[in-house]
């Protein structure tokens, strides 16, 4: 039986011998280097514009470095194993010194920014965040340098539900699907049977149900199997301890809400208002995470 405790702390294969085995040896890009840059920015521009339209967001700028004392940097997980890069700014010969950190994530900053920018209910922000995560295992999915979208939406207490989470996830999925169609229109060579399109439907499944389906596999292998079967899935309830005694993955306690009780479609008690969109990567032949998101914690959760 495989070690089910493996990979609980997060991303990265952590075994380069294993990584070398699974990386494809015959991959060639469908686009030239120039076309790749044009296509990349076409996708980024399309997704940014349409996320703002669908979710009522405005684009803002997020800081690259923050004051340690501000408390707005993120630790990425709940065991403190991933620490940020920190450095001292003497600032006028140490008369006004600052101990600074490079951001690892903008989760806390975004919540503060909603208030700073005066966002009302149903309004939000989108930012293109750059960060350094020095303690990641580096592989074909993960880098120490992060360039990702971060967004935050102000919601009501009543909207803190699994139903609303799914509603937002489905809106985001439609944006991703339409971005796929748009870039294929610009670069028709991207539409090929070798690399099939993302499925139209995104399947929602709780981490507990994946454990039931693949009880002898560790987390990443479970994710790979379900992604291969479904093509695309939103796995929710990540962080709560499952029936085997382990969480699907450890998650920080001050990020998304993986504690709140929910109910499955067939009436079983579950936990968690967070999750990841995973797709089947036809190049690497394994799961690929597109986004991790969720309803934020409250003082109670």
Residue ranges and their predicted role:
Residues 122, 127-219:
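Extended, charged alpha-beta segments that form solvent-exposed binding/catalytic grooves
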Residues 66, 70, 104-105, 157, ...:
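General structural signal for secondary-structure boundaries
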Residues 3, 7, 11-142, 150-154:
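Class II aminoacyl-tRNA synthetase-like tRNA-binding/catalytic domains
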Residues 40, 44, 144, 165, ...:
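Active-site-proximal structural scaffolding
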Residues 50, 54, 58, 175-179, ...:
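Short secondary-structure junctions and interdomain/linker hinges
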Residues 93-111, 163-164, 168, 213-240:
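Hydrophobic transmembrane alpha-helix bundles
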Residues 1-4, 301:
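NTP/phosphate- and nucleic-acid-binding module
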Residues 206-301:
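A translation/RNA-centric and nucleic-acid-associated enzymatic feature enriched
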